Design a protein with these regions (language model features):
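Conserved short strand/loop->alpha-helix "switch" segment adjacent to the catalytic nucleotide/phosphoryl-transfer site
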Residues: 1-25
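Conserved polar catalytic motif of the HATPase_c/GHKL fold
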Residues: 26-30
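Conserved beta-strand-loop-beta-strand hairpin that lines the nucleotide-binding pocket
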Residues: 31-122
């Protein structure tokens, strides 16, 4: 709800809102499941709107980090039980956003930056 309230100033379409909410939900879920496998830890989300309707949302954790980002971004790759996790988190984010950037340091955490241009309604 907070994301939708923030984005309302751009007058997004319902499908645009749904796409962004899905991508952000996936990013936050990944943090909860993977960053802190044995404990609870902080997750920070920031959002900014830039000229031209560019929206950038950054989700950051201070968890275990990702040792091989390229491998983690491969569809179907999972660090958990394949029966419990599909390994599609980053693929889902990429399908709904214009750009997904991931930076991570093992033992220090991960930052996922989601970028999407919201075209003005005609």
């Amino acid at each position: 709800a907070a994301l939708a309230a923030f984005l309302v100033q751009l007058d997004p379409t319902v499908p645009q809102l749904a796409d962004m909410k899905t991508a952000v939900s996936e990013a936050v879920t990944n943090c909860i499941v993977h960053a802190y496998p044995d404990k609870i830890g902080p997750i920070t989300m920031t959002a900014a709107i830039y000229e031209g309707g560019i929206v950038r949302i950054t989700i950051t954790d201070r968890g275990v980090g990702i040792p091989d980002i390229a491998k983690a971004m491969e569809p179907m790759f999972t660090t958990g039980d394949a029966e419990e996790r599909a390994g599609l988190g980053f693929a889902v984010m990429q399908s709904f956003m214009d750009k997904v950037k991931v930076s991570s340091t093992p033992g220090r955490g991960t930052r996922v930056t989601l970028t999407k241009r919201l075209d003005a309604r005609a």
